[in-house]
Amino acid sequence: MKKVAIIGGGITGLSAAYAVKRAIDGGADIDYVLLEKSPRLGGKIHTERTANGFVVEGGPDSFISTKPSIFELAKKLGCEDKFIVSNDEVKKTYILVKNRLRELPDGVMMIVPTKVMPFITTDLFSWPGKIRMAMDFFIPKKEPGDETLASYVRRRLGKECLDRLADPLVAGIYSSDPETMSLAATFPILLDMEQKYGSITKGMIAAMKARLKAAPQGAKPGAPAGPKRTLHMSMKGGMQDIIDELYKAADKDKILVNAEVAGIDEVKGEDGFTAYKLQMTDGTTIVADAVVFASPSNDAATLVENIETQLAGVLNEIPQASSATISLAYRRKDIKHDFKGFGFLVPLGEGYKVKGCTWSSTKWSGRIPNNDYAMIRVVLGGARSQENAFLPDDELEFVVKAELKKVMGIDAEPAETWIFRWPNAMPQYTLGHLDRLKKIKERASAHPGMFLAGGSYRGVGIPDCINSGTKAAEEAAAYLTGITEPAKV
């Protein structure tokens, strides 16, 4: 019986394993094994549920609801009732500018204001900055082609929009540097709108009008039919819920933890076709007819080195940034801040180590044991300040408390803190990323049964990883059952 080995037990690998299991349940005569080198499943999704009732997210705390793969997966798993929406009654996000929290104006889509009055009245931008942003209506479009996000925003909307809006959004949410980000790989819609409308503001307004026209009478524009959804959503017990549900649905004897692959060689299988010999760190070997690499690109590069040095080289060209999160639980009686909002983001030029702060207990239900507490989640590190992700625990906590005191006036000691570190965990889609993907696909296609999946390639979000893992597994199953498919990324 032919076998597929899935390397990596994060959301990508578990989604791949589930897709293979469904293929087997549908009659495919194949086998599989998932190999996770750490003691736990979930990868960057890591929820700590404490005995006294806190739900603490170490990794991502939510997902974007506009991508359907997570809802499709939950429907198959029978866990649709576990989704929760954000508390949009207090839907305010702030940007820290000159040591003051300034509300992000209503109507901002991606990085573009689309509503006139909120844009005119906001104190986030100066009047010269607003006038420069309005010039987007008149600036000619450039020739088609990729450029960095910073170059694009600076050219179309001006430096102040870059510094006060685009920069904190991509640094606080994606841990990225707009000066190196490939626009074609991250926000291709912005390039498309410039070419189609000659202005991204015109393009965003046109898109908003189209959603208004398409929405059923009385419905919120863009809202899907069925249960309520907000732009950002999570799960009742934290994002770990989706990991737990995938494991619950898996064949437990085929999901292995503490199972690290030391190296892989390409060999001939018993049937004469290409196979892969996986050398495990415990000295054992596993022979598989197909391999789904559901690990970060730099890990995959190490494993394919013996097979394809050129492929390994290109995989290593995808940078990975490091970050850290610290969650702090405070007794409400000890603090005066009202926490009316989702949190704030910090531009690079403000000189803070904190990149973003989520007011978790306000944004999400069920994150604190009772209303006697408030919980804050802070992100540090990222592409331009990775050293901050490795500060010693006591120094990291000291820095965060000092900066929260400066921004929010909190001088009380937290009742509890939780620190999580993520070294080389956030792939960076730098300029030339799409060209690298073409090279990766070309080199991987030369090796039948090799499939690459995960956040390093075509989307870093949880729905992107689910889609990537599922697609790779379905292609692997089709390949092993005789419906040959080229290796894809």
Spans of features found by a protein language model:
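Active-site/ligand-binding neighborhood in enzyme catalytic cores
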Residues: 92, 129-273
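Glycine-rich FAD pyrophosphate-binding loop
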Residues: 21-51
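Conserved FAD/dinucleotide-binding core of flavoprotein oxidoreductases
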Residues: 139, 146, 151, 209-240, ...
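Conserved Rossmann-like nucleotide-cofactor binding loop
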Residues: 12, 40, 298
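Beta1/beta-strand and adjacent pyrophosphate-binding region of the FAD-binding site
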Residues: 1-12
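Mid-domain catalytic core of redox enzymes
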Residues: 257-376, 383-389, 402, 406-407
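Conserved flavin/dinucleotide-binding core of flavoenzymes
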Residues: 105-107, 339-341, 356-489
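Dinucleotide-binding Rossmann-like beta1-alpha1 core, especially the glycine-rich loop
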Residues: 51-140
